[in-house]
């Protein structure tokens, strides 16, 4: 290969690199981001994110990376005819952490979180304007329920039931505006009742019954007096 050929190759290669660099991170006439954009972390050359804009609006797929590199830790997919964005979070090894939709950067509708295998559902929950709203289910790796509870505007509301891995009810409590309020029953791992009573403003209130071998063993009324004696 002649020196002239080598020089021409280097010139063409440099021109292509400059052209590619000029094609990313551009603005339109109104000063809005347009076309392909990508940014690196300040402390390194590691890519932080890449994606495309259409006159200031995100379009298509955006990928976000951890400073250590690896698989994208978040992938967001935008569509031009919908206000919702499909979002999936990953570990740097590429296993799913959670997935769902966002609107105006707030979670909306059903979101799923996954066990460490990245495929088995661990949590299924509902969001409204970024707040938990509706039924929230937590599952063991087997798929059996571990917890079923209700939310309204980000607060626990109504009955919440916790289960053992064998499917036995471990406890059933009631919430009002994120505080324990109303009936509560606690069981041992065999499904036998151990304690039952009521809460008021997050504290035990009224008569609580304590069971032994299926029978009431003692009763305590709350609140108790200062020296702790009924």
Give the label of every model feature segment.
Residues 1-25:
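Bacterial Sec-dependent N-terminal signal peptides
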């Amino acid at each position: 290969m002649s020196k002239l050929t080598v020089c021409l190759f280097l010139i063409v290669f440099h021109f292509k690199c400059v052209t590619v660099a000029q094609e990313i991170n551009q603005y339109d006439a109104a000063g809005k981001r347009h076309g392909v954009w990508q940014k690196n972390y300040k402390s390194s050359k590691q890519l932080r994110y890449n994606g495309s804009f259409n006159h200031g609006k995100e379009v298509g797929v955006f990928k976000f990376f951890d400073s250590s590199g690896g698989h994208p830790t978040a992938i967001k997919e935008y569509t031009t005819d919908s206000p919702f964005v499909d979002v999936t979070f990953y570990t740097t090894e590429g296993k799913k952490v959670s997935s769902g939709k966002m609107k105006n950067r707030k979670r909306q509708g059903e979101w799923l979180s996954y066990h460490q295998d990245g495929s088995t559902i661990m949590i299924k929950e509902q969001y409204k304007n970024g707040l938990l709203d509706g039924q929230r289910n937590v599952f063991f790796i087997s798929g059996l329920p571990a917890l079923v509870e209700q939310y309204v505007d980000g607060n626990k509301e109504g009955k919440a039931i916790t289960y053992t891995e064998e499917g036995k009810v471990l406890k059933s409590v009631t919430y009002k505006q994120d505080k324990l309020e109303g009936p509560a029953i606690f069981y041992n791992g065999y499904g036998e009742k151990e304690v039952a009573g009521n809460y008021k403003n997050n504290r035990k209130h009224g008569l609580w019954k304590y069971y032994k071998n299926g029978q009431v063993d003692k009763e305590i009324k709350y609140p108790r007096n200062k020296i702790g004696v009924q």
